[in-house]
């Protein structure tokens, strides 16, 4: 079986489809499909990751997780939700969590001077906007 999730990352305008397939009792394969080159650059790193057992690579401290290490190498936007989405999909595919949507909702408008949907096209980094 394969667990598939869809992620709409936000203002960058990129979405991703993440497929996680259990390869055996301790390993999964992650395949990310997206127009974002930074996200898809993670595919080789996550082609086979050990999620369970001695020496597992996934459910560790953030700085030690294979998912977050790959993200640190390839994704320039620290707040990108894709790494978290990958981990959630691995949990479901491994049978250690139920498939439940995760939501981030802003309950107040952007402060004056902040980028808005009208002024930010997602093509620049935050540093380039300042």
Describe these PLM feature segments.
Residues 4, 31, 103-105:
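Ser/Thr- (and often Asn-) enriched beta-sheet segments in non-cytosolic proteins
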Residues 23-87, 97-98:
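Active-site- and interface-proximal helix/loop "cap" or "latch" segments in soluble metabolic
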Residues 1-10, 46-56, 93:
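Phosphate-binding glycine-rich loops and adjacent basic patches that engage nucleotide phosphates
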């Amino acid at each position: 079986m394969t667990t598939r999730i869809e992620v709409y990352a936000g203002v960058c305008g990129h979405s991703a489809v993440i497929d996680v397939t259990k390869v055996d009792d301790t390993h999964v394969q992650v395949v990310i499909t997206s127009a974002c080159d930074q996200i898809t650059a993670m595919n080789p790193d996550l082609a086979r990751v050990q999620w369970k057992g001695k020496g597992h690579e996934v459910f560790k401290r953030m700085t030690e997780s294979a998912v977050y290490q790959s993200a640190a190498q390839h994704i320039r936007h620290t707040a990108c939700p894709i790494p978290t989405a990958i981990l959630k999909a691995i949990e479901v595919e491994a049978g250690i969590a139920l498939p439940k949507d995760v939501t981030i909702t802003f309950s107040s408008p952007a402060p004056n001077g902040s980028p808005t949907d009208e002024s930010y096209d997602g093509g620049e980094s935050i540093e380039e906007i300042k």
